[in-house]
């Protein structure tokens, strides 16, 4: 099904008129459909570790080469053009004899920063790297993939069975995956916008969720919107999850429901 057909399915659930093209029509139904499409799609994708929207990738931190190290009143001053750090950032330093470890930075300008609480000592000639790391609690941070909706698992070994419900500890904050792995193998739900790949049960769930938003936007705050959302949460989403789990090792705490029950809710 196309995006327009899915939105039309949602509109049909609330008695709305069908659209010819969801991206170009100018009717109130089309405007509302476009307004809530992204919200509903991201919510539905986040609700389950869908097989059709799963990607796996390897993330590895990249260290930045240091240009020079000098003495600034007893503190270690590091020079690197466009270093990208701000005061308060934490950096892990390697191969600088007087500053091996992690330090908080004081930004001097775009090309230099000092290491707080460091003690300069002679002996540096060249080389060394730095890496921006979380301020506390974790050893590394990896930028989220640009198409990531939700991170599902982070492991340290590509041969580890990522279909099982196990993962190394991690946390997602401000566009980064925080963990203790320099190289992380990540399974995540990606923002799959190819509606032709959506299973029928997911389409039914998505259109029902979208209808709950459209009902309130087009008809005002009424019980219809809440009723449709309940149908999504209690019936359509569990049904889609059940179908997804049967394709392989998925989440096992799922329920299934019949299409007849779905039809009766909208009779």
Located regions from the model:
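Small/polar beta-strand repeat architecture
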Residues: 63-135
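Glycine-enriched, solvent-exposed interface loops adjoining structured elements
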Residues: 1-65, 131-267
